Amino acid sequence: MSPTREDLVATAKLFIAKYNEFTPESIISVRTPNSVSHRLFPTRNATRNIGESMEACANAKEVFKSLTVSVIDDNDTIVDERTRKVVFYLASRGDTIVGEWKSECIFIFQMSEDGKLVDRIWAGFDTAYMDEFESRLDGITF
């Protein structure tokens, strides 16, 4: 039986909950072993496998003291049951070594055939905010 809308949304929300734990292990705990994530930047496209995602999280922890993402409005959630995709419009908040982080992003999830794990992620970020944030990090050595 194909996963229902509710199944797909529940898996995407579980991913967000694990993402908010913000550890290399938690961010992959709801992903398939061969899953990939794609960052959607016009100038910074990146595709990461599980190991690369864990490394990116470990590196981000050097900058972020805390990070939380949350669905802005459940009414804006888009679900395509046929392709097993869920789209969330998210707010992200955090404390960093250079001050507050506050932005919005969009995550597109494609689930495994049973709907219980995330197989692919496309993450779109506010590039203007990212550029400004990265300029605050200029000159800082980790």
From Swiss-Prot:
Keywords: Isomerase. Its EC number is 5.-.-.-. It comes from the Eukaryota. GO terms for molecular function: isomerase activity. Substrate binds at residues 19, 39, 48. GO terms for biological process: terpenoid biosynthetic process. Disruption phenotype: Impairs the synthesis of terretonin but accumulates terretonin C. Residues 37-39 are annotated as: Substrate. Changing residue 19 to A: Leads to a dramatic decrease of the catalytic activity. Pathway: Secondary metabolite biosynthesis; terpenoid biosynthesis. Homodimer. Belongs to the trt14 isomerase family. This is Isomerase trt14. It comes from Aspergillus terreus (strain NIH 2624 / FGSC A1156). The lineage of its organism: Eukaryota, Fungi, Dikarya, Ascomycota, Pezizomycotina.
